[in-house]
Amino acid sequence: MKILIAVVFGCLLIILSFSKYFNDQLLDATTKDIKESERPVDKLIGGLLTADFDEGSCLSRYHKYFLYRKPSPYMPSEYLVSELRSYEMLHKRCGPDTKAYKEATEKLSRDEYYASESNGECRYIVWLARDGLGNRLITLASVFLYAILTERIILVDNRKDVSDLLCEPFPGTSWLLPLDFPMLNYTYAYGYNKEYPRCYGTMLENHAINSTSIPPHLYLHNIHDSRDSDKLFFCQKDQSFIDKVPWLIIQTNAYFVPSLWLNPTFQTKLVKLFPQKETVFHHLARYLFHPTNEVWDMVTKYYDAHLSNADERLGIQIRVFGKPSGYFKHVMDQVVACTQREKLLPEFEEESKVNISKPPKLKVVLVASLYPEYSVNLTNMFLARPSSTGEIIEVYQPSAERVQQTDKKSHDQKALAEMYLLSLTDNIVTSGWSTFGYVSYSLGGLKPWLLYQPVNFTTPNPPCVRSKSMEPCYHTPPSHGCEADWGTNSGKILPFVRHCEDMMYGGLKLYDDF
């Protein structure tokens, strides 16, 4: 028994950081050998992925599904698969390095208004990076869905670190916006904001919209300080004008997908794309987001070392909002209260209950936080007292950087690796409002337990709630609907678009459970 305690003690007290763990490792482009007998039958996920890629160039695209102990129960619709293949062909015809793209950018540079809507089949929407990695991923998925619905080409601003994190998602072309794109220089000189003269919301407020004179581009402003006029871009009447504009430039930090369902034209297509409404991000993320080989090496090595032998895996993601941030006892108490109340972790016993007839189960807890104290304290709790179930509890935290360092390559790579590791757990607890958490549980097809935001530095009661949907929350949606639904609470227009559990009076979320 003493030997067992010593071994467990030695395992639990080590919290490995990615920087120390992986700097000692050489990137192995082949990863571990996988026996043919262990390969899943459907590495293309029901046709969600195309086979038109070289596997070695991006190991995670197909190999990441070997790590799942069971396949996702959510399969893409045939219509979604068909639309993705159609989009890939359109992107190949209109993407960077094509004649169509060159002609479109030349027209954009001339900055001439159009008298008609005839601009060919190639129209574009440019995504500008903003805020942390979680925000960037949920907005990329949102903008890509909008591109599918409107038959536009998504181009991604790569002045940040997108290409260091993610592989190209479309075969035979690129989604990266060329650095000589004429409007990029403008962003450095002035910046895109509500005061930008071709901001759609500003043009509406200034009565500057003329249906017979089409601007060469519009800027869509959809961040936390957006006005109601900015949020009208998804409405049917507004889309009839916006659809004629060849170039859209969008800056957003929000998952605006729920609002797209409020447009009847979009809704007709969305219902066919996603019969299971809570699967939007789950499918789009598995299609779009494939970590680079460097990031995937981090994921596979950490998983093999610490998670692969567990009987059960629990992910806990802790984000402390506001100032000061850091380790707080009331947050630690909240995590323990939630996990024990929901039977995710066992209670503590004063004396050990050893069942010699069968070996104890191993439950591994993966903690993602900027602060190491949460995993250290959780470790110490189970070292000090045995679990009521007799399970062995091991706690691991891949990194603890204390400060968010957005746009630092190594920091963002670790963050992406941890999102994927969390998505590979069996159950997950995440902080409410956290886009890092949204990406992790939705990517894994998991319905999370959401930790309520503490008020006045006290532990909430109840500490958490089980979400009925695995979709992210749209934090700053329009407060009302469009046209006929103007003035109606946007969370009460459709039975499947309702307020979020972690933002009861503001956010919107998609649900299948009516």
Curated annotation (Swiss-Prot):
Localization per Swiss-Prot or TrEMBL: Golgi apparatus
Keywords for this protein: Cell wall biogenesis/degradation, Glycoprotein, Glycosyltransferase, Golgi apparatus, Transferase
InterPro entries listed in its UniProt record: XG_FTase
Glycosylation-annotated residues: N185, N210, N355, N377, N456
UniProt-listed Enzyme Commission number(s): 2.4.1.-
Tissue occurrence: Expressed in root, leaves, stems and seedlings.
Pathway listed: Protein modification; protein glycosylation
One GO CC annotation: Golgi apparatus
Coiled coil segments of this chain: none
Gene3D superfamilies: 3.40.50.11340
Domain of life: Eukaryota
Primary location: Golgi
Any Pfam family hit: XG_FTase
Enzyme class, broadest EC rank: transferase
GO biological process, one term: cell wall organization
GO-annotated molecular function: fucosyltransferase activity; galactoside 2-alpha-L-fucosyltransferase activity
Family note: Belongs to the glycosyltransferase 37 family.
Function: May be involved in cell wall biosynthesis. May act as a fucosyltransferase.
Stated name of the protein: Putative fucosyltransferase 10
Gene name, Swiss-Prot/TrEMBL: FUT10
